[in-house]
Amino acid sequence: MADYSTVPPPSSGSAGGGGGGVVNDAFKDALQRARQIAAKIGGDAGTSLNSNDYGYGGQKRPLEDGDQPDAKKVPPQNDSFGAQLPPMHQQQSRSVMTEEYKVPDGMVGFIIGRGGEQISRIQQESGCKIQIAPDSGGLPERSCMLTGTPESVQSAKRLLDQIVEKGRPAPGFHHGDGPGNAVQEIMIPASKAGLVIGKGGETIKQLQERAGVKMVMIQDGPQNTGADKPLRITGDPYKVQQAKEMVLELIRDQGGFREVRNEYGSRIGGNEGIDVPIPRFAVGIVIGRNGEMIKKIQNDAGVRIQFKPDDGTTPDRIAQITGPPDRCQHAAEIITDLLRSVQAGNPGGPGPGGRGRGRGQGNWNMGPPGGLQEFNFIVPTGKTGLIIGKGGETIKSISQQSGARIELQRSPPPNADPNMKLFTIRGTPQQIDYARQLIEEKIGGPVNPLGPPVPHGPHGVPGPHGPPGPPGPGTPMGPYNPAPYNPGPPGPAPHGPPAPYAPQGWGNAYPHWQQQAPPDPAKAGADPNSAAWAAYYAHYYQQQAQPPPAAPAGAPATTQTNGQGDQQAPAPAGQVDYTKAWEEYYKKMGQAVPAPAGAPPGGQPDYSAAWAEYYRQQAAYYAQTSPQGMPQHPPAPQGFANHARSHHHLY
């Protein structure tokens, strides 16, 4: 383009000169205005404008061809949207960042959380997107892809590290066999173990369902050591941690709730009722025969009473009373009064141990349990499963309820019937009595102390202060009543408590015992072990340190002294005869045992002379005169022989 700035304007005198001057002035004015506008807009940039090309060169954006980065470029003025484009462009270019991060494979569930809550929180707080690989490929770590700005990626890493550190295995925590499974053990106070387990295992079952884990309370043994019990939790690491917090929260809540207690030391809480501790050996007294006592208390007080299940390691069982608060308090007072009344009994007096089963009473008076006793009995092999139960559940339940230890003897005695199984119950007399009652309910009949069932038996083992009691109308008594012992004849009713003996009460008590109606003769059986039983009694009385009270020399004679009817049924087939074994046993101990007395053929044997001889020998013994020979004792019912073997097991 030609440069007209050096061309002089045409003269005013020339043709069209006036018009040329007007155009030149207008151009100058326009150029001046353009420079002013450029100066206002571009500041110093306006200096880059020149007059050549009519000043259009100034319309070009400054620094367009500069080598500076985009951030240094000046956005056009009056363009708010355009002014924001460089920072957004910069952010977009920097957000395209993906980094791989490794996390422990066992912690993936803990990082994700229930329903993805945990990982959603991490993404929201950090602004970083997290993608976890579906599996680890057998490696101990799993890959996570973090996408975001460097700051958001670092924030996500920090949050992931915190979660992994929080869920890192604590003492007792280790990974399970399955993929992603972990096992953690927490210690539960012994007093709170029942709270965590709940009635019938309901509480621990609910905890397992809510947390989605498996919980097992580890019990080393039945002994109550007072030590904390480990609770093993197995499952996903995050769920295991949640389950642990739920258990600790349960213990804290219940512990605070139990701060409100009544006069019995038990918590009170509206519909929760009252918890009354009952000595384990006294549970049978509160329940009563066939539950009669506890039913009476419930009816009188208008409440419901249930014994909470436990592991059998505590000295007390908890009776839970539910109902209106005032009635619960009344029922608790009834139970407490019942226990106090029994504990306040006269020492040496008759106790409630008979239960109307033909058993003699001991001198326990509901006090603290004394020394442990042992009771052996046999049951048919076909009924063994009823006592043991599936997986031993029944026998464990009976042991927990009664507090006694029940065992099936794997090594039966010699010459034992292979069709019978021998069980042993160990515990206090009260525990044994309660366990025996529960076992009889399971098998639907009375247990047999080391022998087949018989309709009659003795009251119990004679104590050092009196001769043996005559056979009573109930089932055989187990040899677990501790001395001092005061056996006596049964009351007028089959379930009445036995009457105590006075030192001179044999003469008066014996006729009263004669008035008992004879049992069904068809149920009686001959006993081949009578000689062994007679030898046992003679030897037993010679070992007593304190002689029994004197008895009349001439006691009334009767043909029913053995508690049997007029007819004697033949001995059952296959009956094992232990007479020779017992004779050999006493021979070794220096005791001569005569042959069993013969019985007249046919009909009921007459033992009047034998009983008269027995009392004469007793009178001679009480007078400090040793008998010259062993009295001929009458054959005893089968229960006597079994009783002797059971008592021999104790001593």
Curated annotation (Swiss-Prot):
| Residues with Phosphothreonine modification | 149, 428
Gene Ontology biological-process annotations: hematopoietic stem cell proliferation; regulation of transcription by RNA polymerase II; somatic stem cell division
Listed Pfam families: FUBP_C, KH_1
Q: Which residues carry this modification: Omega-N-methylarginine?
A: 317, 355, 357, 359
What PROSITE patterns does the record point to?
A: KH_TYPE_1 (PS50084)
The UniProt entry, under CDD domains, shows:
KH-I_FUBP1_rpt1 (cd22478), KH-I_FUBP1_rpt2 (cd22481), KH-I_FUBP1_rpt3 (cd22484), KH-I_FUBP1_rpt4 (cd22487)
Regions of biased composition (Pro residues) lie at: 464-501
Q: Where is the composition biased (Basic and acidic residues)?
A: 61-73
Could you give one GO CC term from the UniProt record? Answer: nucleus
Subcellular localization is given as: Nucleus
Relate the assembly described in the record: Found in a complex with PUF60 and far upstream element (FUSE) DNA segment. Interacts with PUF60 and JTV1.
Free-text function comment from the UniProt entry? Regulates MYC expression by binding to a single-stranded far-upstream element (FUSE) upstream of the MYC promoter. May act both as activator and repressor of transcription.
Q: What is this protein called?
A: Far upstream element-binding protein 1
What organism does this protein naturally occur in?
Mus musculus
